[in-house]
Amino acid sequence: MKKHILCIGDSNTHGYCADPMDCADHGIRFNEDERWTCRLQKALGPEYLVTEEGLSGRTTVFPDPINENMDVLSYVYALLKSHEYIDLLVIMLGTNDTKERLGTNPFVIGKGMERLVRKAMTVDCWQPGKQPKVLIIAPPPIGEGMLTNGPIAADMGKNAPAISRGIAEYYKATAELLGVHFLDAAFCQFNEVDYMHLTRQGHAQLAEKIAQLVPEILAE
């Protein structure tokens, strides 16, 4: 049976492309040759199955008063059960948690991730006889240039970049507390349109790094 990797995330997992000139199809979503989840599948090979679960606007545990069903915690049981059995759960969330209307800070976002991972680890969706394996990824911090993009800045709020810079510290602490794995994706390139979404190169960088980690994690 193939080793199953489920990737839960937001628009950076769905593959949103803020700069159509950076996307081969010149659209608003990177294609199957560009998205990090698809690149990860190709890098790992046929012995693995990589499933992408990306939704633009998704948060860890914080309901959005404007857009419904954005917090993955509220339906994570059904989501995980629909993809059983799972060998490794990869979660890259947090960017949308920084929105001003959600009233968060880095510590609270870290607690949100902790609550989500704790819940996920209790769901009966893991390979029989195997312990839950989770990789928490801190998304690249939002660039200060985001504040110059009127519509995006209004949606996110002026403090979003600063809040996002503090997420990795708390995600790392959460991973250590729960005995799961952690990756800081700050090394991945983001675009200079909204300063939040990965470029094609950023997707490639992320896929390459995760592909290095997966065999080590699953060998434990």
Give the positions of each predicted feature.
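Residue-level "edge-of-site" marker
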Residues: 54-56, 188
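Short active-site-adjacent helix-start/loop capping segments
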Residues: 58-62, 98-100
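Alpha-helical cap/lid subdomain in secreted, periplasmic
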Residues: 70-220
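Serine-esterase "nucleophile elbow" of acetyl-processing enzymes
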Residues: 1-54, 61-65, 78-81, 89, ...
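Generic structural signal for helix capping and beta-alpha/helix-loop junctions
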Residues: 15, 58-60, 144, 192
